[in-house]
């Protein structure tokens, strides 16, 4: 079965490889039953690739530099899975939340979930909370654990990996997609502009996504469920619904969609 990886900046809509224009894209989307797909949902940049070969099937404004927002977390997760492949950590590795982590979790202006200082969280739980509810605090917890609380080192790793993969128009300034200044001093890289958003393109995200799924397909077991629960049966239990409404069982579920990261 052919796997298709779609990278859409601004919206995820139904695509077909035979499309010839952006207008046709919107017409086909609405004709497929997605009547809510008004002009406000038109993707600003789009790239559709064959997930088996990496061949480009459709593109529009694929090389325009944009802020990937929460899709930035996919690069952090890529490095986490790389660390697991090297035996540096495992899904069962325990990370104990710090008072700083709890303080970040309490910043409601950015996407977060409840994290309590002193509570143990497995890497698997942190991956789930990073991928599904798009938690900024769990993203930072993973990055900090792997760099001994050195945010600059993690950003260096993100940027080095991007160059290695051939992502020529990408620059990371934070680990999660939220500008560092939004963390109110609890996450402050010293060699990177704390007010700067991350920069990438649809093409670069497709390169990263293609390599991620090829090398570490287990990420999809975290991203393919419409609802997930962490720390079940404990006082810290939380249940999250996916923001990727194309996942089977979600609002606009499509058979075969296995997710990865929304923006």
Cite the ranges covered by each PLM segment.
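Short active-site loop at a secondary-structure junction
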Residues: 45, 58-79, 91-99, 117-129, ...
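Beta-lactamase-like hydrolase cores
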Residues: 5-6, 12-71, 82-91
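Second-shell loop/turn segments in exported
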Residues: 36, 60-68, 110-117, 124-129, ...
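Solvent-exposed, polar/charged alpha-helical surfaces in well-ordered, non-transmembrane soluble domains
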Residues: 55, 78, 82, 124-128, ...
């Amino acid at each position: 079965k052919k796997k298709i990886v779609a990278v859409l900046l601004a919206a995820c809509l139904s695509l077909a490889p035979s499309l010839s224009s952006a207008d046709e894209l919107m017409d086909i989307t609405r004709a497929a039953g997605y009547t809510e797909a008004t002009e406000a949902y038109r993707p600003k940049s789009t790239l559709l690739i064959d997930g088996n070969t990496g061949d480009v099937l459709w593109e529009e404004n694929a090389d325009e530099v944009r802020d990937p927002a929460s899709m930035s977390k996919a690069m952090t997760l890529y490095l986490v899975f790389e660390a697991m492949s090297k035996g540096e950590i495992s899904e069962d590795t325990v990370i104990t939340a710090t008072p700083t982590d709890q303080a970040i979790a309490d910043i409601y202006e950015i996407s977060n979930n409840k994290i309590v200082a002193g509570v143990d969280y497995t890497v698997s739980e942190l991956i789930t909370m990073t991928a599904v509810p798009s938690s900024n605090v769990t993203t930072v917890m993973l990055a900090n654990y792997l760099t001994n609380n050195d945010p600059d080192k993690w950003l260096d790793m993100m940027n080095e990996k991007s160059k290695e993969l051939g992502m020529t128009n990408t620059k990371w300034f934070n680990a999660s997609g939220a500008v560092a200044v939004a963390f109110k001093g609890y996450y402050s890289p010293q060699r990177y502009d704390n007010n700067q958003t991350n920069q990438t393109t649809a093409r670069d995200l497709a390169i990263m996504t293609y390599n991620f799924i090829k090398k570490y397909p287990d990420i999809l077991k975290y991203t393919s469920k419409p609802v997930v629960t962490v720390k079940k049966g404990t006082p810290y239990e939380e249940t999250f619904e996916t923001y990727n409404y194309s996942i089977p069982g979600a609002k606009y579920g499509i058979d075969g969609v296995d997710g990865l990261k929304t923006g």
